Swiss-Prot record:
Methylated. Trimethylation at Lys-200 and Lys-203 may negatively regulate the activity in electron transfer from acyl-CoA dehydrogenases. The modification N-acetylalanine is found at residue 2. PANTHER family: ELECTRON TRANSFER FLAVOPROTEIN BETA-SUBUNIT, ELECTRON TRANSFER FLAVOPROTEIN SUBUNIT BETA. GO terms for biological process: fatty acid beta-oxidation using acyl-CoA dehydrogenase. The modification N6-methyllysine is found at residue 200. It comes from the Eukaryota. Heterodimer composed of ETFA and ETFB. Identified in a complex that contains ETFA, ETFB and ETFRF1. Interacts with ACADM. One of its GO terms (cellular component) is mitochondrial matrix. SMART domains: ETF. The modification N6,N6,N6-trimethyllysine is found at residues 200, 203. This is Electron transfer flavoprotein subunit beta. The recognition loop recognizes a hydrophobic patch at the surface of interacting dehydrogenases and acts as a static anchor at the interface.
Length: 255
């Protein structure tokens, strides 16, 4: 097969080092004035696409993000890492809070068809909702084979070999292209964007479109009832002997 075109999905999330705070009304988490960055699993997906391009196996990498205007910063990061151009599916901030895997998967599937890509790469999950559904749903809408939790990816002609870690060992899949692959942490270690590449990324093209331009309805079928902090754990009690342990368990009604 000739050189491929790859679509890589990137999500803007609260930075992994930030301590999450729940809103007083428990409708979500505080995002205003909080540092955001690219989802770490998405970084791995971008890195893998760039490595395939460096091997002359991929000719173009398109970075895609859905959400408010700030998502363009996330796309710029992908461009600085080596993506060729970006597509921002603009969604107002109020609506973006209700975007779920189903809506994003519909967008990605439509873009994959529109751009005539051969490979869709994305992180296996996002660290904010941990849904682990978008890649699978995208493959379902496209009716393409999928390789999830990829720990190694190898292009073999018109097929892609995906190794994935499972309980008790490794599973190897060979998927006929076009295909969808989701990245595990073990797939690679993303590079840091260099200053020259960051400057070049500012000149690369980002196309801004609406979900409606793709014929996608972003209305969510789910609603968040409440978001709460995990309950605080009570302090443990140290015991010196087995007899003390049994006595303590009896005292608290465990035995």
């Amino acid at each position: 097969m000739a050189e491929l075109r790859a679509l890589v999905a990137v999500k803007r999330v609260i930075d992994f080092a930030v301590k999450i705070r729940v809103k007083p009304d428990k409708t979500g988490v505080v995002t205003d004035g909080v540092k955001h960055s690219m989802n770490p699993f998405c970084e791995i997906a971008v890195e893998e696409a760039v490595r395939l391009k460096e091997k002359k196996l991929v000719k173009e990498i398109i970075a895609v993000s859905c959400g408010p205007a700030q998502c363009q910063e996330t796309i710029r990061t992908a461009l600085a890492m080596g993506a060729d151009r970006g597509i921002h599916v603009e969604v107002p901030a109020a609506e973006a809070n209700h975007l779920g895997p189903l809506q994003v998967a519909r967008v990605l599937a439509k873009l994959a068809e529109k751009e005539k890509v051969d490979l869709v790469l994305l992180g296996k999950q996002a660290i904010d909702d941990d849904c682990n559904q978008t890649g699978q749903m995208t493959a379902g809408f496209l009716d393409w084979p999928q390789g999830t939790f990829a720990s190694q990816v190898t292009l073999e002609g018109d097929k892609i070999k995906v190794e994935r870690e499972i309980d008790g060992g490794l599973e190897t899949l060979r998927l006929k292209l076009p295909a969808v692959v989701t990245a595990d942490l073990r797939l690679n270690e993303p590079r840091y964007a260099t200053l020259p590449n960051i400057m070049k990324a500012k000149k690369k093209k980002i196309e801004v479109i609406k979900a409606g331009d793709l014929g996608v309805d972003l209305t969510s079928k789910l609603s968040v009832i409440s978001v709460e902090d995990p309950p605080q754990r009570t302090a443990g009690v140290k015991v010196e002997t087995t007899e003390d342990l049994v006595a303590k368990l009896k005292e608290i009604g465990r035995i």
